[in-house]
Every structure is written in structure tokens, then in C-alpha cells.
Amino acid sequence: MEKFITIKSTVVPLPIEDVDTDQIIPARFLKATTKEGFGKSLFCDWRYNQDGTPKADFVMNNPLYSGQILVAGKNFGCGSSREHAAWAIGDAGFRVVVSSFFADIFRGNALNNGILPVQVSDAFLKSIFDAVAANAKQELVVDLANQVISIAGTDLKESFVINEYKKTCLINGYDDIDYVLSIKDKIEAYEKTSKYLSLLA
């Protein structure tokens, strides 16, 4: 996975609450088993007409909005468990999703796929939406090392929480296997000195 330290980017605002995984990636697209190619189907039913043409009123079809940060309403990623939702978001180019609440399973799937879910207060989320409404090119700065998100050019910022293990993985670009391999020497040293493991030899 790509290393993640600090991202400064314009945003794609999606001020809709309770966005579930079927809205993120409809079930009819779940037949594929590889991660690539799902980005074009992200928010498909909102993004395209039945004939496949883009809906002009959907934010991802508006040339004013682009970037690596998706900002969504409260309770993002609810509904059925499907890792494809994280795959679609990542394949569409997003590295960060900001909301005031995430479904637990979506949060885990996002982190496992190199996407940082940043949970902020309702008030700070509103500040972001207000700033982007006033200026479509407004940038956010997401500082993972210090666990701070800020609205660029203003004094508005807020800290966020992340599991320390997942933080380490994101900063180093590790998935779970990469992390285990990175501490292989420590594991082997422990195996040699552990009296409990020696009993199994």
C-alpha cells in the first residue's frame, strides 16, 4: 500500500447522512474478486442515469469538485458488510473519508485498504461543508502523524482518533502481512527465548 503521512487536498463534498454500502457500491457489481475497476461504479445509482450517462447534479460529475478527500454526512458506511465499498472508494482516488460517524465494519475495511476514516464532531463537519460551499477549491490538511485535520488557510482544526497499530501500518504503507514481515526478526528472537514455545519443540 502507498505510505500515508500528510495529505493536503481539495475535497468532494457529499452532505448526505446514512450512506450505506449498497449506495456506495450496488450489489450487482460485487461479482468481481479483484480490487481494481470498482471506482467507476462508486455511487453508481446516484452518479449515472439508467442509460449510463452522468447525472449533472451529482457532485462527482461536477468539475468544480475533485480531490483525494471525500467528506460525507453522519453514519457513513452503514448497512451490509462489503469490503468492495472500500475498494471502490480507493479505486476512485480517495485516500481519506471524513464524517462525524462511521459504521465499525466500514471503518475496519477502509483502514485495511489504505483509506483513512477521519471521524470529527458534527460541528467541525459542518464547518468543512460551509467552507467548501463558499470555495469549491478549499483544501483540507490531514496530518496522520499528529492526528489532526485542519481547514487550510483558517484556524479551524480538530484532532481525531485512530488505532495505533493501524496508524503504524498506514504511515509505513503496510498491510497486515507486511507488518508481520517487518518484525520478523523480533518474532524469531522471541521464539528462541520463550520457555513456553520451547516446550512445543
From Swiss-Prot:
EC number(s) stated in the UniProt entry for this protein: 4.2.1.33
Provide any one GO MF term from the record.
3-isopropylmalate dehydratase activity
Per the UniProt entry, what are the Gene Ontology biological process annotations, in alphabetical order?
L-leucine biosynthetic process
Which SUPFAM superfamilies does the entry mention?
LeuD/IlvD-like (SSF52016)
Q: Record's GO cellular component, any one?
A: 3-isopropylmalate dehydratase complex
| Alphabetized PANTHER family for the sequence | 3-ISOPROPYLMALATE DEHYDRATASE SMALL SUBUNIT, 3-ISOPROPYLMALATE DEHYDRATASE SMALL SUBUNIT 2-RELATED-RELATED
Q: What is this protein called?
A: 3-isopropylmalate dehydratase small subunit
